[in-house]
C-alpha cells in the first residue's frame, strides 16, 4: 500500500521533533561570533535570505553551505544539480496578482501606447499557497565556492545602539539570571562582568529584548504564563529563533545552552499542533524586524495591532438555555466523574473502582484512561485470506456489522463493541452518543463542555427523521455560538477548532489601511441582467465584460455592455425576480444592519486589509469565501470595499464541489460534465481512473461540505493519495501538470523498484536452489496429498520440505513455494508471483499436451495430471488463475484452456462469496476457455438440510461470541450470567460446525481423490470426460474454421479465373 503523503507542516514538524530529541534543531546549535551571514539560508540568485518556516526547514537539512536555489536557478547560473539528489520543499504565499485592466463600459482590455494590455495589481482576498523545491549548493556542481561575508562593523556597537534606541528599561545586578518581567515592562540582567564575553552579554540582552517586544504596546504576544508552563516554553521558542536570526545578522553568535530545559515542552507543543512551529517562526521574523528597526536613523513608530472585540454572541447562561444538558444515567455520571479525575492527573479515592473496572461493569467494555473523548463508528466486513480471518472496513461492500472504537491520546484506536442485525448502525450510533455525553460531563472547562453539549444536540437533531430544516439550522447555529464562546475563553480549544483561514492569518503580517470618509448611504444597485455561468466558463464571460455580483453570487452584464454575446448564459426570469425583491424591500440607511443572512452586503476586501475591515464590522462568509457587512457593521467605514468601489477584484471563489472535482481530475480520476461525481456526502465512493478497463473503478474518495470542506482521494492504479482541503481556488494548469508528473514519476519509480526487488529475489532463489535436490521419495506433503513424485519439484537434504519452483511463460524462475512438513505454505519474500506457475511434467510436456489444464494449487494440478496422463499447470492460488491463463494462452494460442477450479461452498455459506468458483470462471472467460469443478458424492460438499441454516451474519455472531467467551475464560473480561447466556445462544451447534468442517475438506480435485468416497476413479471419470468434451468441441470448431477458410480460398480462385477471361 502506498504511503500517504503527509501535509507540509506535519513533515516539517516531525523532522524538527526528531532533531529536538537529538539536540540538533537549528536553534539548538551554538554559533561563534564574528561570522555573519554564515548560517541563515539565502538564495544567491536573488540575494535574499529565506524567512520564517522556510529558513527553519532548510537549516534542518544539515548542510554547511547556506546557499539554496531551484533547479532552474542553478541551470541559469551555469551549474547542474547532481543526478539523484533530492530537493527540499518550501512554501510561499501569494497576496496579489496581476490582471488585465478592462474598460468598464465595453469590457474589452485597455491597451497602452504600444498596444499592449494594461496590467493592474489586485490584492487577493484569499491568498494562495505555492510550493517550490530547492537544492543546497552542496548538491549542485559548478557553483563557485562560498564567499564568507567579511564583518566590517562592530557587532557590539550595533547591539548597543539597538538596546539604547529601543528605550527599554534594563536593570543590572539585581539577579543572577536574565529575564524579562511583563508586569513592570523591564529587562533584568546580571552585571556585565558576569558574562564570559561582550558578545555573550549582548546576545543575552537581545534575547530578552525579543521577549520585551511581546508587550501589549508593541507586538502584543501572550506573555501571561508562569515559568515552566507550556505557554512560557512557546514564548521561549519564539525568542530563541529570533535570537538565532539576529545573531547571524549582527555576527554576535548564538548560545542556546541555557534553554535546554524547554526541549520537552517544545516537543510536546509540536506533537500536539504541528502548525505551532510555523507560528513561532513567523513571530520570530516579526521580532527580528521590530528589533532591527531601531538601527535606522529615523525610528518609525510601531503601530499596535487593533484589539478584536468579541462577537456579540450568546452568553454562557444563554447558551445553556438554548442547548439543554443531555440526561445522563447515574452510573454513566460516575464514569464521567472518574474520567475527569484521570484527565486531571488524580487517582481514584481509596475504595473507588478504577476507570477500567467501572466501565467494564457499566458499559461491558473498558474505556482507555487516555481516551480523548472521540469515538469512531465504522461499517465492517470479515474476510478470510490464507486461512486467517480479519476485520476490514466495508468500503463499497454491504456492511456485515458496525464497530465502535475509542481514540487514544497517542492517535491509535481501541475496539469497544460490535453490532450486527438490522439495527446495527442505529445501535452503534446510540453507543457513540452515550459516550459523547459521558465525555461532555467529564470535561472540566464549562465553555468547552457547553460546546460539546451543543455538538451532541446537533448530531441528535441531524439523525432525527422528524427534524425540520429549521431545527437543523437552529442546532447548527447553537453549536457554532457555543464553539465561538469556547474559542474566546479557552486557548487549547481555540487551537483545535482553528480552520484554514486562521492558518493563513498566522503566516502573513497584517497591513493597515487608512479609512475612507464615511458615506451617508450606499449607492443603489442598478438593474442587472444576471447570467447562469458554469465555473469553467467564468474566464470566458469575464473576458466579454461580465462582472461578479457578490451579494447575488452571480455574474451579470454591466450597463453599457452589449448583452448579445451573453445569450447562451441568459437566466430567464432571474433579473426580474431580483428587481421584484429589491422593490419590495424598504430603503434603509447604510449604517443600519442587514435584516437577514440572505440580504448580506458582500465586500471586496484584500487580505492585507482584512483586520481594518474586521474592526469596522466585516465578517467572513466561509461558504461564499468573501467578507460581508456584519450585523453591527459601520457601513460608512466599509464603503471603500463595496464591490462597485473596487474596480479590480479577485475572481469569485470556486465552489467546494468544483474545486474537489478539479482535485479528482488532477489525481487521474475521470470526472465527466454533468456526471454523478463528486458526491460530497462524507461517504466513501469509487470512481473510474484513467487507464481503467470497462467496469473498473480504481479511484476512491471521500468528500464533505461540513465546516471547512475537506476530503481524501486515492488513485489505486498509481498509488498516489491526497488529503484535500478547500482553498476557494482551483489548481492552475502548471500545478495540475506538476501533480500529474509527480504521479507518473512515482508510478515509474515504484515499478522500477519492484522490478529491481523481483530480479534480486530471483537471483537469490536461484542460488538457494543449488543446495536443494530433486525428490526421489514422496515428502510428508506429497504423502498427505496422495501424490506421485513428478520431475521439477525439489526438497532439502533430509527430504522433509517441499519446494515448488515458479516460472513465467518464457521459462524464467521468479519465485518458489515453500511447503513445510505440516502443509504450511509461503513464497519467497519480495518475489514476483503474478503470472508465474509450475508445470507438472515440465514445459516440453506442456507443449505436447492437447490442452492447457490449469488448477489452483500444486495438489490439484498433480492430481489432474495423473488422471489425464499429460502435463498440467499449477497457478498457486485463485487470484493468479487469470494471469497464468492469459500468459499461457498467448504462448499456445491453438490449445484450448480448461480451468480446474475449487468449489468453496463453505465460504459461500459463511461469507456470502465463493472465491474459488468465481475466480476460475473469470479466468476461463478471459481466454475463451472452460471452467470445471469437482462433483462430490451426496452429502460430502453440501450443507445438511436438517440443520439450522448458517448465514454470514449468524456465523459472524458465532465468532464474536466465541472470542468473548474465550476472553472470559482466560480472565481478560468479566461477563454477567445474562451476558454469558446471550453469547452462548449465538454459538453454532456442534452439528453445524461439523458440517462446515466437512465441507472445507471437500473443495478441490485432490480432495475428490483422497477424501471422497468416489476416489481416484471419480477424478479420472470427471476430468477425462470434461477435457475430452472440450477437445471435441475444439476439434469441431477448428473443422468449421477450416471449411470456412476453404470456402474463402475457393471464392478467391473463382474470382481470379473470372478476371482472366
Swiss-Prot record:
Alphabetically ordered keywords of this record: DNA replication, DNA-directed RNA polymerase, Nucleotidyltransferase, Plasmid, Transcription, Transferase
One Gene Ontology molecular-function label: nucleotidyltransferase activity
Signal sequence interval, chain numbering: none
SMART domains for the chain: TOPRIM
Residue ranges occupied by any Toprim domain in the UniProt entry: 850-938
Repressor among keywords: no
Record's keyword annotation contains Iron: no
Name used for this protein in its record: DNA primase TraC
Amino acid at each position: 500500500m502506498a504511503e500517504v503523503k503527509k501535509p507540509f507542516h506535519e513533515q516539517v514538524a516531525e523532522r524538527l521533533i526528531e532533531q529536538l530529541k537529538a539536540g540538533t534543531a537549528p536553534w539548538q546549535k551554538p554559533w561563534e561570533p564574528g561570522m555573519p551571514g554564515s548560517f541563515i539560508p539565502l538564495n544567491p540568485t536573488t540575494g535574499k535570505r529565506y524567512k520564517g518556516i522556510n529558513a527553519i526547514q532548510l537549516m534542518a537539512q544539515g548542510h554547511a553551505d547556506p546557499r539554496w536555489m531551484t533547479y532552474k536557478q542553478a541551470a541559469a547560473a551555469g551549474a547542474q544539480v547532481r543526478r539523484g539528489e533530492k530537493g527540499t520543499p518550501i512554501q510561499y504565499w501569494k497576496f496579489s496578482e496581476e490582471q488585465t485592466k478592462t474598460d468598464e463600459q465595453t469590457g474589452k482590455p485597455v491597451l497602452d501606447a504600444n498596444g499592449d494590455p494594461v496590467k493592474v495589481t489586485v490584492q487577493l482576498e484569499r491568498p494562495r499557497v505555492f510550493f517550490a523545491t530547492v537544492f543546497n549548493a552542496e548538491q549542485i556542481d559548478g557553483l563557485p565556492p562560498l564567499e564568507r561575508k567579511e564583518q566590517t562593523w562592530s557587532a557590539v556597537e550595533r547591539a548597543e545602539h539597538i538596546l539604547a534606541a529601543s528605550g527599554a528599561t534594563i536593570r543590572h545586578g539585581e539577579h543572577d539570571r536574565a529575564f524579562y518581567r511583563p508586569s513592570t515592562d523591564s529587562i533584568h540582567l546580571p552585571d556585565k562582568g558576569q558574562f564570559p564575553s561582550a558578545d555573550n552579554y549582548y546576545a543575552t540582552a537581545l534575547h530578552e529584548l525579543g521577549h520585551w517586544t511581546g508587550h501589549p504596546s508593541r507586538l502584543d504576544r501572550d506573555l501571561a504564563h508562569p515559568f515552566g508552563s507550556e505557554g512560557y516554553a512557546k514564548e521561549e521558542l519564539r525568542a530563541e529563533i529570533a535570537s538565532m536570526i539576529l545573531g547571524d545578522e549582527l555576527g554576535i553568535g548564538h548560545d542556546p545552552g541555557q534553554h535546554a530545559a524547554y526541549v520537552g515542552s517544545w516537543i510536546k507543543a509540536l506533537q500536539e499542533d504541528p502548525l505551532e512551529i510555523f507560528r513561532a517562526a513567523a513571530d520570530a521574523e516579526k521580532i527580528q524586524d521590530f528589533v532591527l528597526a531601531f538601527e535606522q536613523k529615523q525610528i518609525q513608530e510601531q503601530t499596535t495591532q487593533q484589539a478584536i472585540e468579541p462577537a456579540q454572541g450568546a452568553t454562557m447562561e444563554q447558551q445553556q438555555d438554548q442547548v439543554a444538558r443531555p440526561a445522563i444515567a447515574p452510573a454513566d455520571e460516575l464514569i464521567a466523574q472518574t474520567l475527569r479525575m484521570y484527565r486531571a492527573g488524580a487517582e481514584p479515592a481509596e475504595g473507588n473502582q478504577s476507570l477500567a473496572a467501572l466501565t467494564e461493569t457499566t458499559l461491558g467494555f473498558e474505556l482507555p484512561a487516555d481516551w480523548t473523548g472521540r469515538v469512531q463508528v465504522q461499517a465492517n466486513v470479515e474476510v478470510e485470506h490464507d486461512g486467517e480471518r480479519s476485520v476490514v472496513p466495508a468500503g463499497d461492500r454491504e456492511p456485515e456489522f458496525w464497530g465502535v472504537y475509542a481514540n487514544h491520546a497517542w492517535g491509535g484506536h481501541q475496539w469497544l463493541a460490535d453490532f450486527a442485525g438490522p439495527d446495527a448502525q442505529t445501535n452503534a450510533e446510540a453507543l457513540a452518543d452515550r459516550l459523547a455525553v459521558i465525555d461532555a460531563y467529564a470535561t472540566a472547562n464549562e465553555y468547552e463542555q457547553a460546546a460539546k453539549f451543543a455538538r451532541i444536540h446537533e448530531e441528535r437533531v441531524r439523525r432525527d427523521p422528524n427534524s425540520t430544516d429549521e431545527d437543523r439550522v437552529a442546532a447548527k447555529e447553537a453549536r457554532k455560538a457555543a464553539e465561538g464562546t469556547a474559542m474566546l475563553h479557552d486557548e487549547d480549544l481555540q487551537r483545535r477548532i482553528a480552520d484554514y483561514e486562521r492558518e493563513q492569518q498566522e503566516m502573513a503580517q497584517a497591513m493597515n489601511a487608512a479609512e475612507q470618509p464615511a458615506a451617508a448611504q450606499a449607492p443603489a444597485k442598478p438593474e442587472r441582467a444576471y447570467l447562469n455561468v458554469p465555473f469553467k466558463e467564468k474566464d470566458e464571460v469575464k473576458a466579454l465584460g461580465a462582472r461578479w455580483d457578490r451579494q447575488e453570487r452571480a455574474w451579470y452584464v454591466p450597463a453599457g455592455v452589449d448583452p448579445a454575446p451573453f445569450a447562451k448564459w441568459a437566466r430567464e426570469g432571474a433579473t426580474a425576480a431580483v428587481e421584484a425583491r429589491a422593490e419590495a424591500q424598504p430603503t434603509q440607511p447604510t449604517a443600519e444592519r442587514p435584516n437577514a443572512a440572505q440580504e448580506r452586503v458582500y465586500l471586496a476586501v484584500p487580505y492585507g486589509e482584512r483586520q481594518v475591515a474586521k474592526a469596522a464590522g466585516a465578517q467572513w462568509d466561509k461558504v461564499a469565501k468573501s467578507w460581508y457587512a456584519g450585523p453591527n457593521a459601520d457601513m460608512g467605514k466599509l464603503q471603500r470595499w463595496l464591490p462597485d468601489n473596487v474596480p479590480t477584484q479577485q475572481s469569485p471563489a470556486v465552489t467546494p464541489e468544483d474545486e474537489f472535482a478539479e482535485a479528482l481530475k488532477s489525481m487521474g480520476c475521470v470526472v465527466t460534465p454533468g456526471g454523478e461525481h463528486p458526491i460530497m456526502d462524507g461517504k466513501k465512493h469509487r470512481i473510474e481512473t484513467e487507464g481503467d478497463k470497462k467496469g473498473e473503478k480504481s479511484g476512491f474518495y471521500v468528500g464533505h461540505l461540513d465546516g471547512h470542506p475537506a476530503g481524501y482521494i486515492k488513485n489505486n492504479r498509481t498509488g498516489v493519495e491526497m488529503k484535500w482541503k478547500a482553498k476557494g481556488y482551483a489548481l492552475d494548469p502548471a500545478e495540475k501538470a506538476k501533480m500529474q508528473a509527480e504521479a507518473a514519476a512515482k508510478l515509474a519509480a515504484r515499478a522500477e523498484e519492484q522490478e529491481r526487488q523481483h530480479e534480486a529475489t530471483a537471483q537469490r532463489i536461484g542460488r538457494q536452489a543449488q543446495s536443494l535436490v530433486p525428490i526421489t521419495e514422496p515428502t510428508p506433503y506429497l504423502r498427505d496429498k496422495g501424490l506421485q513424485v513428478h520431475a521439477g519439484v525439489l526438497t532439502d537434504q533430509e527430504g522433509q520440505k517441499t519446494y515448488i519452483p515458479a516460472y513465467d511463460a518464457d521459462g524464467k524462475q521468479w519465485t518458489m513455494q515453500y511447503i513445510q512438513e505440516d502443509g504450511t505454505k509461503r513464497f519467497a519474500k519480495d518475489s514476483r508471483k503474478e503470472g508465474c506457475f509450475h508445470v507438472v511434467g515440465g514445459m516440453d510436456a506442456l507443449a505436447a499436451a492437447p490442452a492447457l489444464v490449469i488448477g489452483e494449487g500444486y495438489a490439484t494440478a498433480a492430481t489432474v495430471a495423473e488422471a489425464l496422463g499429460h502435463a498440467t499447470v499449477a497457478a498457486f492460488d485463485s487470484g493468479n488463475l487469470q494471469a497464468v491463463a492469459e500468459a499461457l494462452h498467448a504462448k499456445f494460442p491453438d490449445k484450448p484452456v480448461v480451468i480446474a477450479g475449487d468449489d468453496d461452498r463453505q465460504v459461500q455459506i459463511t461469507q456470502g462469496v465463493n472465491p474459488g468458483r468465481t475466480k476460475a470462471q473469470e479466468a476461463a472467460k478471459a481466454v475463451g476457455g472452460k471452467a470445471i469443478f469437482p462433483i462430490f458424492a451426496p452429502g460430502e460438499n453440501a450443507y445438511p438440510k436438517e440443520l439450522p441454516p448458517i448465514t454470514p451474519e449468524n456465523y459472524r455472531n458465532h465468532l464474536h461470541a466465541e472470542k468473548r467467551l474465550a476472553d472470559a475464560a482466560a480472565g481478560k473480561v468479566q461477563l454477567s450470567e445474562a451476558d454469558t447466556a446471550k453469547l452462548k445462544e449465538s454459538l453454532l451447534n456442534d452439528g453445524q460446525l461439523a458440517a462446515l468442517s466437512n465441507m472445507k475438506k471437500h473443495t478441490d480435485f485432490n480432495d475428490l481423490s483422497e477424501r471422497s468416497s468416489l476416489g481416484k476413479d471419480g477424478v479420472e471419470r470427471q476430468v477425462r470426460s470434461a477435457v475430452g468434451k472440450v477437445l471435441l468441441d475444439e476439434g469441431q470448431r477448428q473443422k468449421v474454421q477450416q471449411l470456412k477458410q476453404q470456402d474463402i480460398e475457393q471464392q478467391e480462385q473463382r474470382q481470379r479465373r473470372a478476371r482472366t477471361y
